Amino acid sequence: MNFIVEALNEVRKRKPLVHNITNFVVMNTTANALLALGASPVMAHAEEELEEMIGLADAVVINIGTLDSWWRKSMIKAVEIANEMKKPIVLDPVGAGATKLRTKVALEILDRGVTVLKGNFGEISSLLGEFGKTRGVDSSEYDEEKAKVLALSAAKEFNTTVAVTGAVDYVSDGGKVFAIYNGHKLLERVTGTGCIVTAITGAFVAVTEPLRAAISSLVVFGIAAEKAYEEAKYPGSFHVKLYDWLYRIDGEVIRKYAKVREVGV
């Protein structure tokens, strides 16, 4: 998968500035992950400075994890400004389906247009009004066969690239569907790991087209998780090793460990 290596090299060369409107739980986590990868993070939420900040940024990441009425206004305005400036937008609809507010706000953002939509099975299902359920921010009914159909259906419905995460991750642009098999089960025991994927997708989509960006972020992060587990078997030390491997991962490691293929639906 040479395009993944090329995308990573381009991130490290260009150091894209990723503007995150994200949740309180993961601000530090995702900022450090972006830095480890080679990108530059900024966490700015004030509505009054959005136009200036987005003007400086190479991509915008919207994560609704700690949503409230004030953040809702900033998020929607940020998406509108980013679209006007033709800046790529990544949306993580954290907890969509758990409450009406989260689902409504995610759909409001999608109506305005995003470049990549990344969420778990329950979140993406709820946005389509289909078969998933969401408990908190976790998906409770992942099904591999349904997940790949869901990725394709959501990509067509929302006219965007969609990444559905789970035991196997599926990415679709509404035409092709790819399965990514990298990752580790211990990720479930560390908060914010899905949000890291969203943030680094922002870095990748700043340097390559959306389908390749979504695949690259999932493969790179999945390999980093696998390598981290080789060195740390418990959640705390594993979390630290994730940063180390986002920094250490290179073309040789990607070519050796990437597990991604196009699949039929």
UniProtKB/Swiss-Prot annotation:
Pfam families (alphabetical): HK
The protein, known as: Hydroxyethylthiazole kinase
E.C. designation(s): 2.7.1.50
Catalytic reactions of this protein: 5-(2-hydroxyethyl)-4-methylthiazole + ATP = 4-methyl-5-(2-phosphooxyethyl)-thiazole + ADP + H(+)
Family, per entry: Belongs to the Thz kinase family.
Biological source species: Pyrococcus abyssi (strain GE5 / Orsay)
Group of enzyme by EC: transferase
One GO MF term attached to the UniProt entry: hydroxyethylthiazole kinase activity
Obligatory cofactor(s): Mg(2+)
Annotated GO biological process: thiamine biosynthetic process; thiamine diphosphate biosynthetic process
Signal peptide: none
Residues bound to substrate: 43, 192
Binding-site residues for ATP, renumbered to this chain: 118, 165
InterPro entries documented for this protein: Hyethyz_kinase (IPR000417), Ribokinase-like (IPR029056)
Keywords of this entry: ATP-binding, Kinase, Magnesium, Metal-binding, Nucleotide-binding, Thiamine biosynthesis, Transferase
Biochemical pathway: Cofactor biosynthesis; thiamine diphosphate biosynthesis; 4-methyl-5-(2-phosphoethyl)-thiazole from 5-(2-hydroxyethyl)-4-methylthiazole: step 1/1
Superkingdom field: Archaea
SUPFAM superfamilies on file: Ribokinase-like
Organism lineage: Archaea, Methanobacteriati, Methanobacteriota, Thermococci, Thermococcales
Described function: Catalyzes the phosphorylation of the hydroxyl group of 4-methyl-5-beta-hydroxyethylthiazole (THZ).
